[in-house]
Design a protein with these regions (language model features):
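Short cationic/low-complexity microdomains
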Residues: 338-360
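A short beta-strand motif characteristic of beta-propeller blades
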Residues: 58-62, 97-102, 137-142, 183-188, ...
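Bacterial N-terminal signal peptides that target proteins for export
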Residues: 1-10
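Mature soluble domains of exported/periplasmic/lumenal proteins and thiol-rich metal-chelating peptides
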Residues: 27-28, 38, 344, 380
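Blade/loop signatures of beta-propeller domains
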Residues: 28-59
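C-terminal segment of classical bacterial N-terminal signal peptides
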Residues: 15-22
Length: 380
């Protein structure tokens, strides 16, 4: 009897342990060797601590065969990326060889999130999926009532005992899901589609959508903290830094809001072209792409423009700042590196097809997918 109880207890403990999401202190945030999610970390600031090569060279390209709008995640020497064929790929960073793939029933425009030993991604089939990072083994899927196009984000539960995944859907809801079990924790209803990823900081999540509102939600219970009129629908994702939120919208304006004051701090307007790109923010600057074919660098305190960099196509790709450089794609088919201080071109690579996806950046590496159906990796 004692032996039976001991064995049963071991089995129960093993089952419990396997259901946990194990996360170290450095995981879930961008590091020199990791870009685990869209924009690098929960506040969606789009900044990598790594350095870019002065003259990157193409190390490998991986053929998917269908257009890629999903932005890559890099973790543990693997690249994770989705494609319009509905497949999530895991690719060896050093060799460009496929490690595993898993298929969903819809296009994957959402960018993967790597947290602990799991990979999470949304699909246009309306499900949020969880897979084992090392093998691709399906763990669970959570159903929403419409397509998921934006990337998931993550937060610790208020008691610190579990992790939650937060994602928007075209069913008008923001969903909070337990990362270990796939069970819903709460959901928050908006007035229209949710396009982008929710930004997370200081116990709050901020996001916009087609209802032209910037929603501020308590992560503890999914209740409304505030909602702010943006003036037009928001195609992309906001970036947060403390109480400041930076976001562009469809009616050609880029905005800075103060959450504590629930007030608009400044508005930047140049040409009559919308902003689909999500911004990168540093301690001094905000950098965002526009459909006016330009990359804009703004003073984050005043909204005054510092410089503009022109490409030959719409810039829906979201820029990433890597120390004194910026990397961004354009629908002109080129990947660019631009100096942060002056906005001058330092390097470019012609892929030949539109780049809508945003680059993933770690030390000495850039990974990006393109509309030609290839994933490209650049290094020194």
């Amino acid at each position: 009897m004692k032996r039976f109880l001991s064995g049963s207890l071991c089995a129960l403990l093993a089952a419990w342990f396997c259901c946990q999401v194990r996360v170290t202190a450095s995981e879930g945030e961008a590091t020199l060797t990791s870009w685990p999610m869209f924009r690098g970390g929960p506040s969606l600031q789009g900044v990598s601590p790594g350095a870019l090569p002065d003259k990157p060279v193409l190390k490998w390209s991986f053929k998917v065969g269908d257009p890629i709008k999903s932005s890559a995640a890099i973790e543990g020497g693997l690249v994770f990326i989705g494609a319009d064929n509905g497949i999530l790929y895991a690719i060896d960073l050093l060799t460009g060889k496929e490690k595993w793939q898993q298929t969903t029933d819809g296009m994957i425009e959402s960018s993967p999130l790597v947290l602990g030993d799991r990979v999470f991604v949304g699909s246009s089939d309306g499900y949020l999926y969880a897979f084992e990072k090392a093998t691709g083994k399906p763990l669970w899927k959570y159903e929403t009532d419409d397509q998921i196009l934006g990337a998931p984000n993550w937060v610790k539960s208020p008691d610190g005992k579990s992790f939650w995944i937060v994602t928007g859907s075209y069913d008008y809801f923001l969903h909070c899901v337990d990362a270990a079990t796939g069970k819903g924790v709460w959901k928050y209803e908006t007035g229209n589609y949710i396009n982008g990823a929710p930004a997370i900081s200081d116990g709050k999540t901020v996001f916009g959508g087609c209802d032209a509102l910037l929603h501020v939600i308590s992560l503890a219970d999914g209740t409304k903290v505030n909602e702010i009129e943006a003036g037009a629908y928001i195609p992309g994702s906001a970036a947060m830094d403390g109480d400041r939120v930076y976001v562009g919208h469809y009616e050609s304006e880029f905005l800075c809001f103060d959450l504590k004051e629930a007030a608009l701090k400044w508005t930047y307007r140049d040409r009559n072209f919308p902003y689909y790109s999500s911004p990168a923010i540093t301690d001094k600057w905000v950098i965002v792409g526009g459909r006016d074919k330009r990359l804009h660098c703004l003073d984050r305190e005043t909204g005054k423009d510092r410089w503009k960099f022109s490409t030959r196509g719409k810039v829906d790709s979201s820029p990433v700042v890597s120390r004194d450089k910026i990397v961004v794609g354009s629908s002109d088919g080129r990947l660019y590196i631009v100096s942060l201080s002056e906005g001058k071109e330092l390097w470019s690579y012609e892929i030949g097809e539109s780049i809508i996806a945003s680059p993933a950046v770690i030390d000495q590496w850039i990974v990006v997918g393109a509309e030609d159906g290839f994933v490209y990796a650049f290094g020194k």
